[in-house]
Amino acid sequence: MRFSLLALLGTIVATSVSALKEPPTQLQVGVKKRIPASECTRKSHSGDELSMHYTGTLFDTGEKFDSSLDRNEPFVFTLGAGQVIQGWDQGLLGMCVGEKRRLVIPPHLGYGERGAGGVIPGGATLVFEVELLEIKPGKYNQKAMPVQQQQESPISFTSPSFLVSTGIIVALFLIVFKMAKKQDIAEANEKAAAATAEASTEKKEEKKE
C-alpha cells in the first residue's frame, strides 16, 4: 500500500515537472519589478520610442543568446512599428519607466520556424528579462501625454473629425427642414383642395334652388 502511494506521488511530481517545462502557446507577461502609481507618470504606448535593457534565453535549455547588458548599451526602438518581434510589441505595452518584466514568447510571436542568426533555432520559445529605461512619446501619440496635459489640450475646431461631424449635422438639419417644408406644402394643398370642393358643392346646391 505504501509503495502504491509513493508510486502515485512520484507520477504526480513527474507530471507536474513535465507540465512546467511545457512551452506556452500564448504570450506570458510577468511583472518582476512594479512601479508605484504615484511614481509612474507615463506608460508606454504604440508609437513611443523606448530605451531598454534585456537578456534573452531559450525556454527549453535556458541558454542565453543575446543581452544588451553584455554590451552595456540599451536597445532603442519604436514600439508597435514592427521593428521588433510581435511578442515585444504586445508584451511591452503599458509599461512604466523602471519597471521590469519577464516575457515568455511562443514561436509565432517570435522568430517562427525559421529562427534567427544561427543562435535561435526554428520553433523556439523565447524568454526575455526586460527593463524599461526611458520613454520618448511618439509625435502624434496623444495617449502618451500626462493626464493633466491631456485634459488641458484644447479642442481643435479645424480638425478633420470635427469638420466631418459638423457637416453631417448640417446635412441632417437641411434634410429634416426640407421634409418638414414639403409636408407643410402638402397639407396646405390638401386644405385648398378641400375648400375648393366645398365651394363647388355650395354653388351646385344654389343653382338647384
Swiss-Prot record:
Give coiled-coil spans as residue ranges.
Answer: 178-207
**Compositional bias (Basic and acidic residues) spans?**
200-209
- Bilayer topology term: Single-pass membrane protein
What catalytic activity does the UniProt entry give for this protein?
[protein]-peptidylproline (omega=180) = [protein]-peptidylproline (omega=0)
What are the record keywords, sorted? Coiled coil, Isomerase, Membrane, Rotamase, Signal, Transmembrane, Transmembrane helix
The entry's function note states: PPIases accelerate the folding of proteins. It catalyzes the cis-trans isomerization of proline imidic peptide bonds in oligopeptides.
Instruction: Name it.
Output: FK506-binding protein 2B
